Amino acid sequence: MKYICVALLVLVLSACKGGDNDPQLTIQELPPTGPNLDLTLNVLGVAPSMLSSNVSVSDPQGLPIAYSIVQNGTAGTATIHPSSGALTYTVSAHTDQSRDVVLVGVSNGKQSSNVTVTITLKIDPLIPNQWHLHNVGYSAFASTLPVSGNDMNVAGAWREGFTGKGIKVAVVDSGLQIGHEDLAANVDVAKSFNFLNGSNDPSPAAAGSDHGTAVAGIIGSVAFNGKGGRGVAYEATLRGYNLLANGASSLTNFGNALGLAPYSSDVDIFNESFDSSSTQLPPQVNSYNAINANALTLRGGKGAILVQSGGNSFSSFGNVAAVCTQAKAFGVSCGSTSSDTRRDGTLPIVVGAIAADGTKSSYSNAGSSLWVAAPGGEFGRNTSFVPGQSGSSIEPAIITASRSGCNNYSNRVNALDSLGSSPLAAQCQYTATMNGTSSAAPNLSGVIALMLQANPNLGYRDVKYILAKTAKKTDPTRTGVTTTGLLNGTSVTLDQGWVRNAAGYWFSNWYGFGAVDATEAVSAAKIYINFLPAMESVSSNSNFSSIENVPQYSTAGSTLTFNMNPAFTKVEHAMAILNMNDSPGLACNQIELISPSGTKSILMHALNGYSNNGVPQQSITNSRILSNAFYGETAAGTWRLKFYDFCPTTVGSRTSFLPTDIQSLILTGH
């Protein structure tokens, strides 16, 4: 009996072991614990954006911990490694959310708890509408949607971290609102300049919109700040020079804005989104040539980059509509990229404009001096706000910053440009109606800023080479304009469409070498080491030995030859300096240049609108027309310059040349 009681006592004690006051059991039942996480993600919007972190917890018992996603985000998707806690969070495209929450479960196999991961999403609310950056057919506020795929392909360059950081871009324009909420952080106020009052604030003084502010927004609107859209080179440094302000456009100011002043002498890229008001084929102006030539000395001798808009006179040239009647009827350009002497020479990169469907913008000038084309859009109106509009009026424009203050505007034309009724532009500080080659130029300037960040050693000619090599053949099936309507059934080609030259480059007077591709250009710039040797040039003169009357109403034409034997082999540019004694009107004339390889470039097509207040221009004096169509071809050999007169004999005087009308051909190359 005694032994039985002892055994019972042991049994009772065993049953009592591990009760509520036992510390060992309390420790075993505690779950893993750790701090919540607060993370931040810059949302690219044009490509997947991802962050990586680690959920760090500990278990009181030192037991293994298992991780899992209990509740995923609504803007993005999280994954986690089940044993290490390595967390990845991805937003696939744009999101309107500024915050997302993910719950991570942690378990030791006995108990579990949650860790809250809060992600602040830094976005730009208008970026899905900015088709020029990334075009998936999303609304740009116009009635017509963009056609998916027609964009500058910036995504790859941005994903690699190229943002324009460290590159200085001058906006040579009407002004620049330096306090704009989406520009201020990128503006170098100390190196900006106001030509009207000598201050460093080029913000416009008079009421109204500001062209330069919109241009600056395309280049360098600030990213990831929850405001507006995004610039192509969203970390570039912007400077404003209000050369185009009323009363500021002197030759001295022009030079100072382009590198001749201390505040502009260290600029990398000059953006010139302007055109001449002249409707004539002008003589070259040596003073402008000298200013452009000075830019060659900048960037430590590598040359600053001059980006110039190609002009907006395809169907309207000056204030006399009649000068464009024939050009419009035959579908050729009334104006030309050659109508502004400030675009002269081999330095400027002249850019045309492309619409959101990948074809030439309705207004964009054609010309042999174009280098590439970039998005310029159309007019951005919406019939919900402006009934009765159609065609290019309701096709997408470019979305960018605009001068703040609704008192500067008077019309509602779409849901963004709605006098402050849009929460996205309550102060009218953003627009969806910016267009023109004025928009194409800053788009290209932004891409070049990305290229220079990728490779600061690029010279200006290296930049041009890379752009030509990487441009896309947009509107690839375009065949040009050939008609039998001019010469009583005889076929005449006024525009050749796409032509492949003897060096393998495709070229078009509508698009230059094609549409700029940011990712391809930056990829090429990164690995570029075969820098072009010094540029050389050769020139030759030719003239008719006696008075030459060009055959009228004929494809026979009159021809001059130039025998070129330069020390260099490959052509970069060809420039003709032209003189013509008399013409019934330059609209009758076509001028073509043919290389030794047989490539033809139309320097000036017939039916152009060259005139003076509606009166046809009837002579040419020392005018320079540049062609890029021969890029990479062999320079040596016989070049031919051909002049035509397609007007009937009943129209005015004959096209004629005197022996003193000297024609010059200048080739540059390496």
Model-derived segments and spans:
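Surface-exposed or secretory-pathway low-complexity segments enriched in glycine-proline
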Residues: 49-90, 115-119, 587
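Substrate-binding/access-modulating region of protease and related hydrolase catalytic domains
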Residues: 163-165, 210, 222-226, 240-345, ...
